[in-house]
Amino acid sequence: MRQSVAQPFPPMNESEFHRAVDEVLARIERAAEATQGIDSDLEAGILTLECRDGSRIIVNRQTPNREIWVAARSGGFHFAWKDGTWRDTRSGAELFASLSRIAAEQAGESLQFG
């Protein structure tokens, strides 16, 4: 059984969650646009990052769980809001650091978040 490390704190209502995720997706999209080898497409709340080799990293919201989900070649990851940042529900790793690592592994180019 999957044990969650992160719980929303403070709890977000649905509107706050959507606003927070929209900001996250926009930030990821800006980071992808600053690269040479990762294209981004945001449609219907799903952000697709396409690498030069045609592989994809998908970032989307999971509203009922108040999580951000990331699907990549290396696996699936769930992030929940905890202590002021988005944390992997299994490892506790921070979302933007994880995405940078995932992009470096998959696309050969990390995402830089400033």
Briefly describe each language-model feature range.
Residues 1-11:
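Short, Lys/Arg-enriched N-terminal segments with co-localized hydrophobic residues
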Residues 9-114:
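N-terminal intrinsically disordered, cationic/polar leader segments
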